UniProtKB/Swiss-Prot annotation:
One of its GO terms (biological process) is response to zinc ion. This is Manganese import system permease protein ScaB. Keywords: Cell membrane, Manganese, Membrane, Transmembrane, Transmembrane helix, Transport. Part of the high-affinity ABC transporter complex ScaABC involved in manganese import. Probably responsible for the translocation of the substrate across the membrane. Essential for growth under Mn(2+)-limiting conditions. Gene3D superfamilies: ABC transporter involved in vitamin B12 uptake, BtuC.
């Protein structure tokens, strides 16, 4: 099977596009996911990934690139959630739940109005084997941009993630870096739709980062390890999907989950097996 997969990479251009895109998404989602779980924003990641759905549907209706609509609605959802949380007694999880369900419902209504149901199905559940050249290059461009922003603002994102009160006392614009991270999260969510769809994007963000957290002792190490795990799971999941003719996006997610499960038992920081033995 491995030989057939390698031969397929040599013969089929669509598989080459899928492999490159999968690696890029795995690396970038793994990096951004580290900040998401450190801030306790896993639910926010899920909300943003689903909030882009009405933007995608509206883009199909209007005949424009789905990146435009998805990014617009993703950022809009982030702004609404932050505004509700900051201007009412409602807690963040409640604000996220209200916004998430509302945007999802709007997306479903727009899907029923849109004509291109096949393309929308791919957006919902992913079809990385159908990635075109333009989509691949957009993914690469977004990936480079996201990693560049993380590199430039690493110290600020680090401090605002671990101790926002201290960061604010030092004069840092905490809200600015919050929205900056939301922009990065939205960009990654839109890009990852091609591989796993809006339904499973949060798994690409959270699972590799959570696995890396079990091993890493510093944020830099965590980001590097999470990106490597994300890329590795993407390649292995693509191989499984192509070889066994199953959904590649779901295979990527399950591969990442399996790596986490193994790490849960053997990671030094977890020490689950040692505690059970004792």
């Amino acid at each position: 099977m491995i030989q057939e997969f390698i031969q397929g990479l040599h013969d089929f251009h669509f598989l080459q596009n899928a492999l490159i895109t999968a690696i890029v998404i795995g690396v970038v989602a793994g990096a951004v996911g580290c900040f998401i779980i450190l801030r306790g924003m896993s639910l926010m990641g899920d909300a943003i990934s689903h909030a882009v759905l009405p933007g995608v549907a509206l883009s199909f209706i209007l005949g424009i690139n789905f990146f435009i609509g998805a990014i617009t609605f993703g950022l809009l959802a982030s702004i609404i959630i932050t505004y509700i949380k900051g201007n009412s007694i409602i807690k963040s999880d409640t604000a996220i739940g209200i916004t998430f369900s509302s945007f999802l419902a709007l997306g479903i209504i727009l899907i029923s109005v849109a004509k291109s149901s096949t393309d929308l199905f791919h957006i919902l559940f992913g079809n990385i084997l159908a990635v075109q050249d333009l989509d691949m290059w957009i993914s690469i461009g977004v990936g480079i941009l996201v990693l560049l922003v993380i590199s430039i603002f690493f110290k600020q994102l680090l401090l605002t993630s671990f101790d926002p009160l201290l960061a604010q006392a030092m004069g840092m614009k905490v809200n600015f870096y919050h929205y900056l991270l939301m922009i990065l999260l939205t960009l990654v969510s839109v890009t990852a739709m091609q591989s796993v769809g809006t339904i499973l994007i949060v798994a690409m963000l959270i699972t590799p980062a959570a696995t890396a957290y079990l091993y890493a002792k510093s944020l830099k190490t965590m980001i590097l390890l999470s990106s490597a795990l994300g890329a590795g799971a993407s390649v292995l999941g693509l191989f499984i999907g192509y070889s066994f003719n199953v959904a590649a996006g779901s295979s990527i997610v399950l591969t990442s989950a399996l790596i986490f499960l193994v790490s849960f038992f053997i990671a030094p920081k977890q020490r689950y097996l040692k505690r059970k033995v004792k």
